[in-house]
Amino acid sequence: MVGNWKMNNTIAESVDLATAIAEKVGADGVQCEVGIAPTFPALYEVCKVIEWSGIRLCAQNCHYESDGPFTGEVSTRMLAAAGCSYVILGHSERRQLFGETNATVNLKVKKALAEGLSVILCVGETLDERERGVTGQIVTAQVVEGLIDVTDISKLVIAYEPVWAIGTGKTATKEQAQEVHALIRAKVTELYGQKAADHLRIQYGGSVKPSNAAELFAMPDIDGGLIGGASLNADDFMAIVEAAG
């Protein structure tokens, strides 16, 4: 269960929120793996306040080179040095707003895995694509092309986030989400075999709230969540975490 804070919170606000979540995780004894993804400037300070709790520090993006003339970018080795163990790649906002392609995402995935980071690979269709009936084609292409030349997926998580449900208040029904998650797992089975697919965790993201989390997480192929807006409130985020059992 990962909270993606996106471009929200100052360093001080991030530390306060992380502290509140860490205290709740420690007190509640949660059964699932929990991560939070603050902004880049807050990573190091947040790391200090969660390192005792078992919460994973996640980054929201990375570059596919280790160093160099890439103004405004952050490399995987810098993220690792800041305490990150996960990085979110291919989020729909990166694809839609910043023009990231499957090929670019693939370069980042390979770099992050090579540097020892775990990767949350985001996939999902737009409203237009869903209405045209090509959801399966779009999502499986994002999976296949995002994983070109990746031979080991033991440190991979895939997050299905229908673009039309992110930040809109709309949520895929549990049946819609399960259908796509099953497609993803079937494609991974085809690419990497049944054992790897069975061990793969597939998250759902897209307006997950305390009120709908339990029914989503009850689906057989939904293994967790990538939570946006609700993760900015410690109580709401923990209610979702607890819904995952």
UniProtKB/Swiss-Prot annotation:
Entry EC number(s): 5.3.1.1
Keyword Nucleotide-binding: no
Enzyme class (EC, first level): isomerase
Any one Gene Ontology BP term: glycolytic process
Keyword Isomerase in record: yes
Cellular component GO terms held in the UniProt record: cytosol
Alphabetized UniProt keyword annotations: Cytoplasm, Gluconeogenesis, Glycolysis, Isomerase
Organism, as annotated: Chlorobaculum tepidum (strain ATCC 49652 / DSM 12025 / NBRC 103806 / TLS)
Biological role: Involved in the gluconeogenesis. Catalyzes stereospecifically the conversion of dihydroxyacetone phosphate (DHAP) to D-glyceraldehyde-3-phosphate (G3P).
Name of the featured protein: Triosephosphate isomerase
Complex and partners: Homodimer.
Active site per UniProt: 91 (electrophile), 161 (proton acceptor)
Superkingdom of origin organism: Bacteria
An example Gene Ontology molecular-function term: triose-phosphate isomerase activity
Reaction(s) this enzyme catalyzes, per UniProt: D-glyceraldehyde 3-phosphate = dihydroxyacetone phosphate
Location in the cell: Cytoplasm
Coiled-coil regions, chain positions: none
InterPro entries: Aldolase_TIM, TIM_sf, TrioseP_Isoase_bac/euk, Triosephosphate_isomerase, Triosephosphate_isomerase_AS
HAMAP family, A to Z: TIM_B
Pathway(s): Carbohydrate biosynthesis; gluconeogenesis; Carbohydrate degradation; glycolysis; D-glyceraldehyde 3-phosphate from glycerone phosphate: step 1/1
Family affiliation: Belongs to the triosephosphate isomerase family.
One Pfam family matching this protein: TIM
CDD domains the record matches: TIM
